[in-house]
Swiss-Prot record:
UniProt family annotation: Belongs to the ClpA/ClpB family.
Signal peptide segment: none
Gene: clpB
Description of its domains: The Clp repeat (R) domain probably functions as a substrate-discriminating domain, recruiting aggregated proteins to the ClpB hexamer and/or stabilizing bound proteins. The NBD2 domain is responsible for oligomerization, whereas the NBD1 domain stabilizes the hexamer probably in an ATP-dependent manner. The movement of the coiled-coil domain is essential for ClpB ability to rescue proteins from an aggregated state, probably by pulling apart large aggregated proteins, which are bound between the coiled-coils motifs of adjacent ClpB subunits in the functional hexamer.
Region (C-terminal): 765-858
Region (NBD1): 160-341
UniProt-recorded name of the protein: Chaperone protein ClpB
Organism expressing this protein natively: Rickettsia prowazekii (strain Madrid E)
Chain intervals for the UniProt region annotation (Repeat 2): 84-147
Length: 858
């Protein structure tokens, strides 16, 4: 016996049976150990042989283990010597002899298994008693190998290669494990047309990720199963090639090629009845190419050209262009079938078709409004992915979320139980006290506890009943699904009696029971129907865009948005109204969906509230005044600085980092973008804004389209500020506007100005405005001091003093801020550090003659 003539798997079995004997403290290595090792081998070849003969591998394993337990254990200090029994060596010799007689160059595991049938010990008897003899086994091996000889050390890897390295899609269709395919008739028809050709009958499905390329293959498999295809394809089977399994473990040079050749050989022998489906077709180019070896695509080319291999590929347009088109010889052997993104209407039909599968899996119900919302909202708000994939993901996640909620305790009941635990803890603590107040408290808490426990018991009973009803409905859905699969099978096999029983008896009965089980009280504790609001909530979490159903409180808030913004911005009613209208349009869903929510050019002198209004708007929308992207346009005075906004071009440093503007909007699609002091930027920068303002999108340096449709864009400028500063009381507003617009038109191109929603003038602040701003500024200071437990008070004289001294029509409110810092904050800081003002003090500010006085009240 030459151990080198055994395959790698056979050597592994021999090593394992030796380890088994040592592990069990047996002195001899017996054929029984060899049989046990064979039954546990990982390739599945022995199991396939036993199943073919009609044996039961689990029964064999139990019998072998029973006999192994009977062998006496011998334990010797320091480790005893273990040796091969004569019978074991005889079996291995016999396996070599069988392999040689069969024309094999190497001894494989099935030859060792065959040799065991000639064994006269207990191992051979177990096989004989289970109906496994040498004659049956030889026939099964011949069927398994399909006439192939074991001529390599990895011969077992080439047996039944299609089953090992592929997935039978047609079999999945037969077992009802594929989702129904709605639409895509044209693409399936085109694929069938190419497959029916005499030569080069290999379609390649090309389309964006998520449009349903693999679904077309599943649809074709279902049509083959239902015989809804031309005669040439009726007996075909679609096998999906697993390239990962093909490559995995191919450690020796040439092993990958042998595996692939074994797959191709089986396909060739099938006489055109096997259609090979290769997902991610571009992976074939270069796969297996090491040190001059041929890659997978070169192995396929001859068979593809001769029409011996029916192959369907699937890849994206970018990868087809990058890998397949570069290899012209490979590209010409495939016929492209372009798969486009389905429309929203088609997506709704697809979702309705797969609805039952998701309801069955998640044990929930999906409303039709949820399906429509998933298609329309995903198309509108998730712009970097494709239909129907993104819509299906929304349905799946919404169902998953509801399933988790159904399996956990209802929130109302959970809060009740927590309150009961809290009361019990309080009672335990109060029982240690003897005073009268504690006794009264114990009495009141005990009464409350009784009421809550009674309520909890009732709710718990109701919850369990509802849960039981849902579980019953789920079981009925599973039975209904299985009955429908059985009906299809019965109709296909022409078993009319069974088909009639299922169609007119069993299925209607299950449906009636299911209808009764689903008639749950809408006011129950459990909600099992996925609605439109659930889909909107999922999109809000994914994108950050608040499109979930507005609460009545928010509706009221949006109607008074002007009042909220006026609390921060004084004297700019026209600007506030324009911005407020834009927000209301967006939140009510009636704005143009192909443009940003609003685009404004704020014109006015410094310090009148242009930037402040933008911050106030961000604060209103996000409850955070700093939740806006602020881009200071004075940093973009050079032409080349455009690359900072959209990313550096290929070949430059920072190409892979993205742009300041595009990356921010990609990560947070719903935000306020402030381009501050736009007149200072290079004029070429405004050219990239044209498509943002008009189409609501921008392509960055990497070719990724960024969606700006959910942003509010604000541009601020000081152009024409001199005119607005010198504007007299009661002067014609239209005349002033025309003069300012002359300055604006001299700087900005008409196509840029024409794309803005509104150009808003910020007028200079008057004394009354400054008086109101003083209140706001001191109010902010009051809040800061309150954090240190210091109360700040000021009278009307102090307000008038600050308004008079802080008023400068040319500089707006900014001098006022500096005045408050100089006159109040500096003095307060000194007094706090000196210990004159401490926590709990009240500080009163009033005017005394021509200055402010700060008085401390304990």
């Amino acid at each position: 016996m030459n151990i080198d003539k055994f395959t790698a798997h056979a050597k592994s079995v021999i090593a394992n049976h030796q380890s088994l004997a040592i592990k069990n403290d047996h002195q001899q290595i017996l054929p029984l150990h060899l049989l046990s090792s064979l039954l546990s081998e990982e390739t599945g070849i022995i199991q396939a042989l036993i199943n073919n003969i009609g044996g039961n591998i689990n029964l064999l394993k139990d019998q072998v283990q029973l006999e192994l337990n009977k062998i006496p254990k011998i334990q010797v200090d320091g480790g005893g010597q273990i040796y091969y029994s004569a019978e074991d060596l005889k079996v291995l010799e016999k396996s070599s002899s069988i392999a040689k007689d069969s024309g094999d160059s190497f001894v494989t595991i099935e030859r060792i298994f065959e040799a065991l049938t000639y064994d006269n010990t207990i191992a051979g008897k177990i096989l004989t008693n289970n109906g496994i003899n040498s004659k049956k086994l030889a026939t099964a091996i011949l069927h398994l190998r399909k006439g192939k000889k074991a001529d390599t050390e990895s011969a077992e890897n080439n047996y039944d290669a299609l089953k090992r390295y592929g997935r039978d899609v047609t079999e999945l269709a037969e077992n009802g494990k594929l989702d129904p395919i709605i639409g895509r008739d044209e693409e399936i028809r085109r694929a069938v047309q190419v497959l029916s050709r005499r030569m080069k009958n290999n379609p390649v499905l090309i389309g964006a990720p998520g449009v349903g390329k693999t679904a077309i293959i599943e649809g074709l498999a279902q049509r083959i199963f239902s015989k809804d295809v031309p005669e040439t394809l009726i007996n075909c089977r679609i096998i999906e090639l697993d390239i990962g399994a093909l490559i995995a473990g191919a450690q020796y040079r040439g092993e990958f090629e042998k595996r692939l050749k074994a797959v191709l050989s089986e396909i060739k022998e099938s006489s055109g009845e096997i259609i090979l489906f290769i997902d991610e077709l571009h992976l074939l180019v270069g796969t297996g190419k090491v040190d001059g070896a041929m890659d997978a695509s070169n192995l396929l080319k001859p068979m593809l050209a001769r029409g011996e291999l029916h192959c369907i590929g699937a890849t994206t347009l970018d990868e087809y262009r990058k890998y397949i088109e570069k290899d012209a010889a490979l590209a010409r052997r495939f016929q492209p079938v372009y798969v486009g993104e389905p429309s929203v209407e088609d997506t709704i039909s697809i979702l309705r078709g797969i609805k039952e599968k998701y309801e069955l899996h998640h044990a929930v119900r999906i409303s039709d409004s949820a399906i429509v919302a998933a298609a329309t909202l995903s198309n509108r708000y998730i712009t970097d992915r494709y239909l129907p994939d993104k819509a299906i993901d929304l349905i799946d996640e919404a169902c998953s979320r509801m399933k988790i909620e159904l399996s956990s305790k209802p929130e109302e009941l959970d809060e009740l139980d927590r309150r009961i635990i809290q009361i019990k803890i309080e009672l335990a603590a109060l029982k240690k006290e003897n005073d009268e107040h504690s006794k009264k408290k114990i009495t009141s808490l005990t009464e409350e506890l009784k009421k809550l426990e009674s309520k909890s018991y009732d709710m718990n009973t109701k919850w369990q009943a509802e849960k039981s009803k849902l579980q019953q409905a789920q079981k009925l859905k599973e039975e209904l699904e299985q009955a429908r699969i059985d009906l299809e099978r019965a109709e296909r096999d022409a078993n009319l009696a069974k088909a009639s029983e299922l169609k007119y008896g069993i299925i209607p009965e299950i449906m009636n029971k299911l209808q009764e089980a689903e008639n749950m009280d809408n006011k129950g504790l459990l909600k099992e129907i996925v609605s439109e609001s659930d889909i909107a909530s999922i999109i809000s979490r994914i994108t950050g865009i608040p499109i979930d159903t507005m609460l009545s409180s928010e509706r009221e808030r949006l109607l008074v948005i002007e009042q909220k913004l006026c609390e921060s911005v004084i004297g700019q009613d026209e600007a506030i109204k324009g911005v407020s209208d834009a927000v209301r349009r967006s939140r009510s869903g009636i704005q143009d969906i192909n443009r940003p929510l609003g685009s404004f050019l704020f014109l006015g002198p410094t310090g009148v509230g242009k930037t402040e209004l933008t911050k106030a708007l961000a604060g209103f929308l996000f409850d955070d005044r700093n939740a806006l992207l602020r881009i200071d346009m004075s940093e973009y005075m050079e032409k080349h600085s455009i690359s900072r906004l959209i990313g550096a071009p290929p070949g430059y440093i920072g190409y892979d980092q993205g742009g300041v503007l595009t990356e921010s909007v990609r990560r947070r699609p719903y935000q306020v973008i402030l381009f501050d002091e736009v007149e200072k930027a290079h004029l070429d920068i405004f050219n990239i804004m044209l498509q943002i303002l008009d189409e609501g999108r921008l392509t960055d340096s990497q070719g990724i389209t960024v969606d700006f449709k959910n942003t509010i864009i604000v541009l601020t400028s000081n152009l024409g500020a001199e005119i607005l500063v010198n504007q007299k009381e009661g002067e014609d507003t239209y005349k002033v506007r025309d003069e300012v617009m002359q300055y604006v038109r001299a700087v900005f191109k008409p196509e840029f100005l024409n794309r803005l929603d509104e150009i808003i003038l910020f007028h200079r602040l008057n004394r009354n405005n400054i008086h109101d701003i003083v209140k706001i500024q001191l109010g902010s200071l009051k809040k800061i001091l309150l954090q240190q437990n210091i109360i700040l008070e000021f009278d009307e004289s102090a307000l008038n003093y600050l308004a008079e001294k802080g008023y400068d029509p040319s500089f707006g409110a900014r001098p006022l801020k500096r005045l408050i810092q100089r006159e109040i904050q500096n003095n307060l800081a000194k007094m706090i550090l000196a210990g004159e003002i401490s926590s709990g003090n009240t500080v009163k500010i009033r005017r005394e003659k021509e200055e402010l006085s700060i008085n401390i009240i304990d």
